[in-house]
Amino acid sequence: MKISLTNRVRTTIRERKLFREGNRLVLVALSGGADSVALLCVLRELGYETVAAHCNFHLRGVESDEDAAFVEGLCRDLDVPLHRIDFDTVRYARERSISIEMAARELRYEWFGLLRKELAIEYVAVAHHADDNAETMVLNLCRGTGISGLCGMPYKRNDGIVRPLLDATRDEIEAYLLDQKITYRTDSSNEDTRFRRNLVRHRIMPLLKELNPSLQEALLRTRENLEGVAAFFSKATEDFHNTLRATASISIREVKETPAPFTLLYDLLHPYGFNRDQIREVVTSLDNPPGASFFSSSHRLLRERDRLTVLPLSPKMEVPELFGLKIGDSFLDLPDGKQLSWQRGTPADLDLEGLRLPNTKLLLPLAFVESLQEELGVRRPQRGDHIHPYGMKGCKTVSRFFIDRHVPRRRREEAWLLCQGTEVVWIMGYAADRRFAIDELSDTEEYLLFSFEL
């Protein structure tokens, strides 16, 4: 017997303990699309008192305003209190050199948090469903992820975000709306495959379903299996986390006695801002003499005689300042008088001479730069920086790269790095990271050509 959407959501709320017992007031993120409209209606059916929150990101011209008008009308008809806000999403993304998708996400969740406190509402219900979660699992797999990433979206977050539709499929949601004769808005940008999620939805998922027509069920089983693994792993590492929180250090001997020191240390140190390459170097240091230090943006890790100690950075130990890039500009003046400049255009528009060895020039796809989820910026080197040098095999620290190239210490200290978050993209004037290299140019695609002279 096919379960109704309302009963499915009721079961999810009960089994996943989404709401504290006795709490019937919920803030619903209401875009006007099928998923959020169904979520609002189902929660009302289940007896929850709902308040709606609508974001107008002004990304689709008149369509965005029509969405807002639809939401206002729906809430008026249902007698649901509505709070709405307008965002200049494009400007926000440009100022922070992040993708439109990431900008909208940051703006949305920041406002939800503020509104939740203002209205004294404990939970914010968002309308992600099972198909969204399957797409997230595939996206995370393509990016490279761990157990939690392969589990997809959590049903409940610590900041009050809950996902009551996460066990329901898109087909079930649309069937419910059709049966109840409920209208909704359709977002035309959902068909735009320039956005990564849409690319996965419209191209990759159909191909995967050719391999396995029961892909949705297979991914659900995978998620359930991995949730069990994640719970088991969390329990196994609980003592290490408690010790690190209580003493700011952990025993090197105990780490080395575990079957997977890197996996353990990644789980322990990633929350402090250390990246995978740094943590690999930490693992290597376990078999070396004490004294090594590693830096994240907020913490310092010391390899002492028998312990690893994690300390917050003091003002005297600040990591190098990051100078953010605004892609809409054409240059960045650096404090030492040097300048990083860039041009935008197709290959025919750009002077690509000398690009074969990317020392003073670097070429990146414009779409890639715009889609970066972390800030692209320029800073000085810091301990633990790694690079996969273009034209070479393997990975090495930036300091080892300079030593191998016989670069004088003064020149090393004066070097500049182009970075995406914690990843080194380019030792400016020396070498690019091959992971960001372009294998084949497209005559029609736009690129950014960066130039820097030592």
Swiss-Prot record:
Record's keyword annotation contains NAD: no
Gene Ontology annotations of biological process type: tRNA modification
UniProt binding sites for ATP: S31, G32, G33, A34, D35, S36
Gene Ontology CC annotation, any one: cytoplasm
InterPro entries hit by this protein: Lysidine-tRNA-synth_C (IPR012796), Rossmann-like_a/b/a_fold (IPR014729), TilS/TtcA_N (IPR011063), tRNA_Ile_lys_synt (IPR012094), tRNA_Ile_lys_synt_N (IPR012795)
Catalytic activity, reaction form: cytidine(34) in tRNA(Ile2) + L-lysine + ATP = lysidine(34) in tRNA(Ile2) + AMP + diphosphate + H(+)
Gene3D superfamilies referenced in this protein's UniProt entry, alphabetically: HUPs
EC nos: 6.3.4.19
Compartmental location: Cytoplasm
Keywords recorded for this protein, A-Z: ATP-binding, Cytoplasm, Ligase, Nucleotide-binding, tRNA processing
GO molecular function: ATP binding; tRNA(Ile)-lysidine synthase activity
Disulfide pairings: none
Function statement: Ligates lysine onto the cytidine present at position 34 of the AUA codon-specific tRNA(Ile) that contains the anticodon CAU, in an ATP-dependent manner. Cytidine is converted to lysidine, thus changing the amino acid specificity of the tRNA from methionine to isoleucine.
Domain comment (free text): The N-terminal region contains the highly conserved SGGXDS motif, predicted to be a P-loop motif involved in ATP binding.
Family: Belongs to the tRNA(Ile)-lysidine synthase family.
Name of protein: tRNA(Ile)-lysidine synthase
Gene source species: Porphyromonas gingivalis (strain ATCC 33277 / DSM 20709 / CIP 103683 / JCM 12257 / NCTC 11834 / 2561)
Gene: tilS
